[in-house]
Every structure is written in structure tokens, then in C-alpha cells.
Amino acid sequence: MKNKLREDMPSVKDIRIFRSRIIRWFNKNSRNYPWRETCDPFKVLIAEMMLRRTKADQVKQVYERLFTEYPDVEAMANAEDKKLEQVLYPLGLRWRTPAFGSVAREVRERYQCKIPETREELTTLSGVGEYVAGAVLSIAYNKKEWIVDSNIVRLFRRYFGIKTSKEGRRDKHVIEVAKIYASVRNPRKANLAILDFTALICIPGKPDCEKCPLRRNCHYVCSQS
């Protein structure tokens, strides 16, 4: 791998320093959610599907009830859509509800109730895109798999000064940086760290630069001074 990705892109060394500072911050500031207390790939998959366009605190209210009633793939595969809809109702976005039963049935029929361990297989499942697949692989299986959402794109743009395409989540340069970021001994921790950092520090609108451990080398901060 080349040390430099592109003229306006960070070096591998820069990305590693960035990662180590975020993980150090995470060690003292991590958020606690029930789906982070398990490495059960089924629970991680369903939690990540619930978290799409939904705040974590809303998902927290539903998570325990959902897995009390449907603790595994087989139970959710056999669930009636109307009953699933009742449990998931507080999340809103009712159009997502059918995907939960569908994904459980697909896993049962195609993978004998075992959640796939590759991005290629995961992304063939109902309701599973690149982000959810990467989250499952890194968080449940601790694989060196990348995740990119709009928050991570924002952080990369601000800190590194990366120029991206309009659809930043699919930008090949952003994905390349995310791949290097996740290439670490504990990708689960690294990816959870960047998610919390973008939720608590490098937030939309006005970031909390005063509390940011990255501010000294941040392209955004330097441009404001």
C-alpha cells in the first residue's frame, strides 16, 4: 500500500495517529448500550438495522423487549409481521419493519441460522447495506472491516480536509481511509470509538472543538483561526 493515497489525502501514518487519539478519547468517554455488551452477531445485526435513521436512545427502549420475545434467528423468522410491528413501533419508519422478519428468514434458509461472516454475503440480505455489514463484521466478529456513514464522512472532511464527491459515503477515497482506520488489532473498539466521537464531539453544525483531542492537527480548526 502506498504511504500517500492522493495529494489531498492523509498518509497512512496520519490515519494511524488520528485513530490512536480517538481510541484514547474513547477509553474515557465511551457510551453504554445493551447491544455493545454482546458479540452475538444476530443481536448486533438487528440492532444496527434498528439504528438506521434512529437515535440510539430510542433503540435502547425497544432492544430489550425485542430480544426477550425473539431471542434468536429462528424465533424472529417465525414471528408474525404484525407482532414485530407492535414491538418496533416506537422506532417509527414503519416501512423498515418487514425487513426484520425477512432477514431472519433469509439467514435461516440460506445460512442455517448463522449470520454470514463476509461483506459480500451480508449485503445480499434484506435491509443490509455496506454500513450495516461492516458494523456486524467489525463489532460482532472483530474483523478488520470498514464502516462509513455521514458522520464519519463529516469527521474525515473536517480533520483531514478531504475533498469528496457529493455522495461522501460512497466516495472511494473516504472508503480507503476508513479501511486503513479499521486495520488495527481491535477493529471493534476502533469503529465504536469513531462512532461515539462523531456523536459527542465532531457533531453536525458546531463541533465541540474545545473538548476535541484532535484540534491541534485539525484542518477545520486551523481554517477557523
Task: Locate each region found by the language model.
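Thiotemplate assembly-line natural product biosynthesis machinery
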Residues: F18-W25
